[in-house]
Amino acid sequence: MSYVVLVADRLTKSYDGQPALRELSFELQAGRVMGFLGPNGAGKTTAIRILTTILRPTSGRFVIDGVGSEDPARVRPRIGVLPETLGLPNQITGAEYIGYFAQLYGRRRADARRHGLATLELVGMRERAGRLIRTYSHGMRQRLGIARALINDPVVLFLDEPVAGLDPRGQLDLLALLRDIAKDRGTAIILCSHGLSEVEDACDDVLVLSEGRVVASGSVSDVLALARQRVSGTDLRIHVPTSAAERANATLRAIPAIESVRGGIVDGRLEVSLARGPDQAIEGTTNEILDQLLGDEIPVLGFEVEGSRLQDAFIELTEGRSS
C-alpha cells in the first residue's frame, strides 16, 4: 500500500529579501517518481538543497519518513542524493568505493562488502565491481553514483540531471532502472531535470516551477491536460482524397467541437484545431469527427491525433501565456 513519505509545507527561501522559493508545498508517496521542472532560476535547485538539508528554509518545513526538517541529522540517513557532478576517485574499484560508503553507515568490513556488491547488482554493475573506476564509461559512473545514493536504503532518492551526457540508449536504460527501483523497493524518487522527455517517460508526477512558485503540479497527464486547455495549434491531421477535400472541409466546419480547418484543397491533407474546453475529451471528439466524415461518405485515408507533449506544457505554463 502506498503512503506519504515526504511532505513539504510552504517552504520559502529568500536571499537579501529576494525570494528564490515561494511557499513550496507538495506530498510524495512511496514508490512514486516526481519530476521537478522549470527554467533556470525557477527554484528547482534551491528546493532540492533544502530537502537534502544543505540549506535551511527561511520559513516553512518538511517531513521525511516522520522526521521534521528541524532535525537534519536524523533526516540525512533517510535520503540518498545523486548530485549533478559526482567527482569519483579513479584509482579504486567500484566495489571498494561502494564498500567504503557502506562502512560509513556503520557496517563492518565483510558485511559492507556484501551489501555493496548487492547494491551494485541492483544497478546492473555487479560484473564490473572489480574494475577500476577510471575504466568506467559515463553511464557506468552514473550507475555507480546511484548505487552510492542507495547504499543506506533511503526512503527518498534525489537525483540531479541523472541522464545528462548519456546517449539515447543509455538514457532509456537508466530511466528504466529508476522506475524499477521505485516500483520494486518502494523508494520515492525526485528527479530534477532540464530534459523534458526523460521526465515525461520516467515520472508519475510533475511539479513545474517558475520564478520560485509552483505553476502546475499533478500527474504527467494532469499537467498536459492543464496546458492543453491553453495551448492553441493543430490537434488533428486528416487525409482525404483531393476530390473530396471541399466536402470534407464543409463537414468539419459544421462540427461544434472544431475551431478551425486549414489546407486540403491541393493535396487533401487537412489540419484541424479543436475548440478548447475544460472538460473536453479528445477521444470522444475524434470519434464524432470520424463518424461525421464517414456518414457523409467521405473516404478517410489518414487520421493522426497530435497530442500536446510535456515540452508544450512546460513552455506554456512557465511563460504564463494566456489562451
Predicted region positions:
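Hydrophobic anchor residue at the start of the ABC signature
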Residues: 146
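ABC transporter nucleotide-binding domain
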Residues: 175-276
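Conserved ABC transporter NBD signature motif
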Residues: 60-70, 74-75
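Conserved ABC ATPase "signature" region
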Residues: 99, 103, 110-128
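Conserved catalytic motifs of ABC-family nucleotide-binding domains
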Residues: 153
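Catalytic Walker B motif of ABC-type/P-loop ATPase nucleotide-binding domains
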Residues: 157-160
